[in-house]
A protein has these predicted regions:
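Active-site catalytic microenvironments for nucleophilic, acid-base chemistry
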Residues: 55, 78-82, 156, 182-186, ...
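Beta-strand elements within well-structured catalytic alpha/beta cores of enzymes
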Residues: 11-15, 65, 165-171, 175
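An N-terminal RHG(E/S)-centered segment typical of histidine phosphatases
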Residues: 1-62, 77-81, 85, 211-244
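Glycine-rich phosphate-binding loop signature in dinucleotide/nucleotide-binding domains
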Residues: 58-60, 157-165
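Acidic, low-complexity terminal tails and accessory targeting/binding regions
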Residues: 1-11, 99-121, 163-165, 181-244
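Short glycine/proline- and acidic residue-enriched helix-loop micro-motifs
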Residues: 119-145
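Phosphate-coordination/substrate-recognition cap region in phosphate-metabolizing enzymes
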Residues: 7, 50-127, 195
């Protein structure tokens, strides 16, 4: 927390998962139904997630949220594994963090119990049924509906974490775009801007207590799509146009 003239309520870190087999654009006909609809990280994606975890190994989070899709939970796990003693100890799975149209309706998604067997460090966000599925189907939703979903997630977090709390949200490129717009008060139907979230890119947004932000603005974009944790191993990543 800073001085009384500039009081931080929440530091929000919006993060995209590591590279997946789906990101490579290759045919996945030989994959199982689960692996086609709920893709896993590639070896490179796993390494990206590990480097992400190292980035925050001395940076305690009050909470780490993840979507209920495996690629996000895999990535969030690498953050949790490397948190300092005073950092977050589990991953909070929030079903509304699912990717925009990220799964087919024929795929019902994992139950919490199934996911817990794969990722023992998860818990379920307050207000959701442990016996239910942990993803949301949003294929065909309008931008306005997707933005409303992002606003629900943001409201959930901001109502629970205050007084300088640090929260990481590990989700997906398209959904993170709506979360980004929601956090900054932007209308995606009017603003032509693609944040272009890359794998394990980190975006930091700070919310100030009302009336205490610089220039009387209570939200600040500190940095967007930061990949500095990958530069040592992937010096050209993010320099040339790329989509994963």
């Amino acid at each position: 927390m800073s001085d009384a003239a500039n009081v931080i309520e929440l530091e929000l870190y919006i993060i995209r998962h590591g590279q997946t087999y789906g990101n490579l654009g290759k045919a996945m006909d030989s994959f199982s139904e689960l692996d086609r609809n709920d893709v896993l990280l590639t070896d490179k994606g796993q390494h990206q997630a590990e480097k992400l975890g190292e980035r925050f190994s001395n940076y305690p989070f009050d909470a780490v949220y993840s979507s209920g899709l495996r690629r996000a939970m895999q990535t969030a796990t690498e953050i949790i594994k490397r948190q300092p003693e005073n950092g977050a100890e589990n991953i909070i799975v929030h079903p509304l963090l699912s990717e925009v149209g990220g799964v087919e309706e024929e795929y019902s998604g994992l139950t919490f119990s199934q996911a817990e067997k794969m990722f023992p460090c998860i818990s379920l966000a307050e207000g959701f049924d442990r016996n239910g599925r942990i993803i949301s189907f949003t294929k065909g939703w309008s931008d306005k509906e997707q933005l409303a979903r992002a606003e629900k997630v943001l409201s959930h977090i901001r109502s629970r974490y205050k007084d300088g709390a640090r929260v990481a949200v590990v989700a997906h490129a398209a959904f993170n775009t709506f979360l980004f717009h929601s956090a900054l008060g932007l209308d995606p139907e009017k603003v032509i801007f693609d944040p272009h979230f890359l794998n394990t890119g980190v975006t930091k947004i700070v919310f100030f207590r009302e009336g205490t932000g610089r220039y009387n603005i209570d939200v600040q974009l500190v940095y967007q799509n930061d990949l500095s944790h990958l530069y040592a191993d992937y010096p050209d990543y993010g320099v040339e146009p790329c989509y994963f």
